[in-house]
Swiss-Prot record:
Belongs to the thioester dehydratase family. FabA subfamily. Homodimer. GO terms for biological process: unsaturated fatty acid biosynthetic process. This is 3-hydroxydecanoyl-[acyl-carrier-protein] dehydratase. Keywords: Cytoplasm, Fatty acid biosynthesis, Fatty acid metabolism, Isomerase, Lipid biosynthesis, Lipid metabolism, Lyase. Pathway: Lipid metabolism; fatty acid biosynthesis. GO terms for cellular component: cytoplasm. It comes from Rhodopseudomonas palustris (strain BisB5). It catalyses: a (3R)-hydroxyacyl-[ACP] = a (2E)-enoyl-[ACP] + H2O; (3R)-hydroxydecanoyl-[ACP] = (2E)-decenoyl-[ACP] + H2O; (2E)-decenoyl-[ACP] = (3Z)-decenoyl-[ACP]. The keyword Zinc-finger does not apply. GO terms for molecular function: (3R)-hydroxyacyl-[acyl-carrier-protein] dehydratase activity; trans-2-decenoyl-acyl-carrier-protein isomerase activity.
Length: 175
């Protein structure tokens, strides 16, 4: 049975990372430190900019987050690729939540724009993913647009994010 709530707390996200939320072998979030949000505040198969669903999540920012210590020394900033990865994580979660089977993989994105930075003084990051299309066949493919805001200012925009769920992706042991 899949967990179909409309919001999820941090412990739920950790359960997803352990493969406990959508069943063994299905969509998982990464575990910390690569899990890039603290809660999912809204998820729905309706609504969003395209009327086909949305997912919204938040990250509480503090100067002790792991990436500030190494990116960059004396000039701390959250790497833009981590914000992009959060959007892919959310799209994969949406596919698992929607009933897709198999582990997820990011497949790409269209246009991506960064117009600001997540710095240690930022209090909250909000991520939003608006579903454009979900293809359900052997491969489940989600296509969406997303944005990231830092303290209520949108600073990243991504178009045509793509994530797929694949029934067979397990790494084969080296010969």
């Amino acid at each position: 049975m899949r967990d179909r709530r409309s919001s999820y707390e941090y412990e739920d996200l950790l359960a997803c990372g352990r493969g406990e939320l959508f069943g063994p072998g299905n969509a998982q979030l990464p575990l910390p430190p690569m899990l890039m949000f603290d809660r999912i505040t809204e998820i729905s198969e309706t609504g969003g900019a395209h009327g086909k669903g949305l997912i919204r999540a938040e990250l509480d920012v503090n100067p002790d987050l792991w990436f500030f210590a190494c990116h960059f020394k004396g000039d701390p900033v959250m790497p833009g690729c981590l914000g992009l990865d959060a959007l892919w994580q959310m799209l994969g979660f949406f596919l698992g939540w929607s009933g897709g089977e198999g582990p997820g993989r990011a497949l790409g994105s269209g246009e991506l724009k960064f117009t600001g930075q997540v710095l240690p003084h930022v209090r909250k990051v909000v991520y939003n993913v608006d579903i454009k299309r979900v293809m359900r066949s052997k491969l489940w493919l989600g296509i969406a647009d997303g944005w990231l805001s830092a303290d209520d200012e949108i600073i990243y925009r991504a178009q045509d994010l793509k994530v797929g769920l694949f029934k067979q992706t397990a790494a084969k042991p080296a010969a």
